[in-house]
Amino acid sequence: MNTLRIGLVSISDRASSGVYQDKGIPALEEWLTSALTTPFELETRLIPDEQAIIEQTLCELVDEMSCHLVLTTGGTGPARRDVTPDATLAVADREMPGFGEQMRQISLHFVPTAILSRQVGVIRKQALILNLPGQPKSIKETLEGVKDAEGNVVVHGIFASVPYCIQLLEGPYVETAPEVVAAFRPKSARRDVSE
């Protein structure tokens, strides 16, 4: 069977130069381990806020490492060195605007400055590439969505649509732990993976 391959890219000048320890990749690894019931392999990269390096890294993960999903963290704000969305769009075959729109909607429930985010979602070849926030708490909120005090979903997180998108791109059938995030697919796209 086709193993799910995920690229994780933390984009930070200071973390990549050793000024402080990266928190983005560990947060993503922990979240994916709790959310995915499908086996997966990770390719991780810690790089500076340099557009050419970001573009090169995204292309390497998709074109050479055959990742089905690439998650970036950091570099999505309005500051001059925040070029992650620009690099992502530069290597995209198609834009998926709903992902960026939904990430901002989710984050606005927690902080008004979420409107300053320029996160995007794109497709390059067989892969979905998503720009996530830089803070671990915000990463989790964006992926899982907004829940009420009882744990019921009020606003769906973006990851609910990721497994079906990967399936549409002819990648592996991805399943999630519904208590973390329930993957959504139309009934016609569901399959019994125990077969």
Swiss-Prot record:
**GO CC annotation terms, alphabetical:** cytosol
One of the Pfam families matching this protein, by short name? MoCF_biosynth
PROSITE patterns linked to this entry: MOCF_BIOSYNTHESIS_1
SUPFAM superfamilies listed in its UniProt record: Molybdenum cofactor biosynthesis proteins (SSF53218)
- Enzyme Commission number(s) of this protein: 2.7.7.75
> Which principal EC class is assigned to this enzyme?
transferase
What pathway is this protein said to act in by its record? Cofactor biosynthesis; molybdopterin biosynthesis
Q: Which InterPro entries does the protein's record reference?
A: MoaB/Mog-like_dom_sf, MoaB/Mog_dom, MoCF_biosynth_CS, MPT_Adenylyltrnsfr/MoaC-Rel
Instruction: Report which reactions are catalysed by this protein.
Output: molybdopterin + ATP + H(+) = adenylyl-molybdopterin + diphosphate
Q: Would the keyword Transferase be found if you checked this record's keyword annotation? A: yes
Keywords, in A-Z order: ATP-binding, Molybdenum cofactor biosynthesis, Nucleotide-binding, Transferase
Tell me the GO molecular function terms.
ATP binding; identical protein binding; molybdopterin adenylyltransferase activity
- Keyword Glycosyltransferase assigned: no
BP GO annotations: Mo-molybdopterin cofactor biosynthetic process; molybdopterin cofactor biosynthetic process
Question: What's the family?
Answer: Belongs to the MoaB/Mog family.
Function, as annotated, reads: Catalyzes the adenylation of molybdopterin as part of the biosynthesis of the molybdenum-cofactor.
| Subunit record text | Homotrimer. Interacts with MoeA and MobB in vivo.
Query: Per its record, how is this protein called by name?
Result: Molybdopterin adenylyltransferase
Please tell me the species this chain comes from: Escherichia coli (strain K12)
- Gene that this polypeptide is encoded by: mog
